[in-house]
Regions:
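N-terminal intrinsically disordered, low-complexity tails
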Residues: 7-32
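Compact, well-ordered interaction domains used in eukaryotic information-processing assemblies
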Residues: 27-117
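Charge/polar-rich, low-complexity and marginally structured segments
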Residues: 117-184
Length: 184
């Protein structure tokens, strides 16, 4: 049985329209809450200078990530790895601090409880290294270095950033070499 449609129109006939009348359109930003799709593939980046890998949980097989490389994994696989305590993702504290593998998708990091909307995950990156080398006091530099660089992967990563970044402060580079026991 067909349904009866009733509609109202808000359009004016062309004859009624004033050509000098300004038409305003209200624009209001609407936040669209995206459903958290566990099948969506997201990028995972390794900070390690060596090949890393782990066994998949949700499907058969292994994941192999090349040195300083990336791989695309489903959100479901990442959440499963985190919930099973994979240290490559969870880092030294279980909250993603000083992790070897960094999830480049913010909603997935939030779902894994690695960060919130206001506080980012504690992981080494180029911006943190630049801020470290902008510290004026050598004492503050060393204390920040010791809190920022904890794991073996981070020690190799900071040396890679120094090689690529052309940092000119000899004393700070030597302090990093002494701490990491690696040479630039």
């Amino acid at each position: 049985m067909p349904t009866k449609r009733t509609s109202t129109t808000t359009t004016k006939k062309v004859e009624e329209m004033n050509p000098t009348e300004k038409i305003t359109v209200e624009e209001s930003p609407v936040e669209v809450e995206e459903d958290f799709n566990l099948e969506k593939k997201v990028t995972v980046r390794s900070i390690a200078e060596w090949t890393t890998g782990f066994q998949r949980i949700e499907t058969n097989g292994d994941v192999t990530i090349p040195p300083n490389g990336t791989v695309r994994l489903s959100r479901g696989e990442i959440i499963s790895q985190v919930q099973n305590g994979n240290l490559l993702f969870t880092g030294i504290d279980g909250q993603g601090s000083h992790a070897t593998l960094y999830i480049e998708d913010k909603p997935t990091r939030i779902e894994a409880d690695f960060e919130t909307e206001s506080s980012p995950q504690n992981v080494i990156n180029k911006e943190h290294i630049d801020n470290l080398f902008n510290i004026k006091s050598m004492k503050d530099f060393e204390s920040t270095l010791h809190s920022m660089v904890v794991t073996r992967a981070e020690k190799y990563a900071i040396m890679g950033f120094i090689r690529k970044g052309n940092f000119n402060d000899y004393n700070k580079v030597r302090a990093v070499e002494n701490y990491t026991k690696l040479q630039v």
